[in-house]
Amino acid sequence: MAAFDRILSGIPEMDQALDNIRLGDNVVWRVSHLQEFRYFCEPYVEQAIKDRRNIIYFRFASHEPLVKECPEVKRIEIPLSHQFENFTVEIQKVIEREGFDAFYVFDCLSELQTAWATDLMMGNFFRVTCPFLFSLDTVAFFPIIRGKHSFHAVKKILNTTQLLLDVYSDPNNIYVRPAKVWNRDSETMFLPHIYKKEMGTFR
């Protein structure tokens, strides 16, 4: 496939509202808790399986897995050591090996702050990894936890990623507010949206 080709997220109305996720996109989901990320990660993985994509899940955090074990998804366990360089190099080796057009899910980046005792290193990891993924026309989903990081760390991510989507939820609705959508043309992409998972609507 060609760079910046549209892909399917598994939520058709979200594709329409955001003018699609594209090859090369790093998609950061800023959430209050990881269940909010799962609302969007699960259909993304299910769609990628249907589309016979090369799907890789980077597993390094202590939280519950974000992707269920299945033969269609490669689960890569990367020990989350205190060494920024070692961890980053191991991730990049896998990305290089998997090559073009791969689809990724990363564990929560907020856990990097705990391991490295600073969230600026989390921002540095993203700033190094994101352009490499972009150069290989991949798609990658990353969750971060809202309110856990400094302005400077979040700014590094915001300046580097192609999409940053804020997700909020209550017992009745899931709300999405795009904070950054790069190189799209849609009248609705910066509007707040309500996602009703059971109905599949995103309006």
What residue ranges belong to the model's regions?
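Hydrophobic/aromatic beta-strand patches that form the interior of the parallel beta-sheet core
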Residues: 27, 56-58, 74-76, 141, ...
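Phosphate-binding/switch region of NTP-binding enzymes
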Residues: 145-203
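Short glycine-/polar-rich loops that comprise or flank the Walker A/P-loop
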Residues: 24, 52-53, 137-138, 159-163
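Conserved nucleotide-binding/hydrolysis micro-motifs of P-loop NTPases
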Residues: 34-35, 61-65, 81, 109-111, ...
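Substrate-engagement module of ASCE P-loop NTPases
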Residues: 115-116, 121-148
